[in-house]
Amino acid sequence: MAKIAIIATDGFEEAELIYPYYRLKEAGHKSVVISLGKRPIEGKFGYIIKPTFKIDDVSAKDYDGVIVPGGTKNPDYLRRNKDVLDFVHTIDQQNKLVGAICHAGWVLISSKVIRKRKATSYYAIKDDMINAGANFEDSSVVVDGNLIFKNFFRILCQTYSFNC
């Protein structure tokens, strides 16, 4: 049973958080929502979620992977938080699963984990990914070792299996 952190804050894309959260649970894994604080967070379309933990109360060593959902505001806020960046960077350094959906590539850019690695993203941040040194592929899904990128939430159902 894997323990996967889903890191999000206000402005998350609901489908990109809710689908992996429940799909992991259905497969027998433990999924938790980690945020910048303990207050409820509001998604892009108004869905409210109460985080399980706040980022400064967790350690990457206790998790088997991390997923960062997109939306435009969510990753923009997350990439400004040192604890989030350290968490994602440490998970990557431990060769554990790092999933980024849509605009979440911004968090991986700021975590310094995509240079010289294959990646994809929502088309609007393609230049950001390339300028950060990613080997960008215009594809729905890109896997490079422990990194899994999805360019848009609509393809989640097709490929987020996490070896379940």
Predicted regions and their residues:
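Extended, subdomain-level signal for the structured scaffold at the beginning of enzyme domains
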Residues: 1-94, 98, 107-113, 126-138, ...
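Short, thiol/selenol-centered motifs that function as redox-active sites or metal-ligating centers
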Residues: 101-103
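Exposed beta-strand and adjacent loop surfaces of beta-rich binding modules
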Residues: 116
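Anionic-ligand binding patches
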Residues: 119
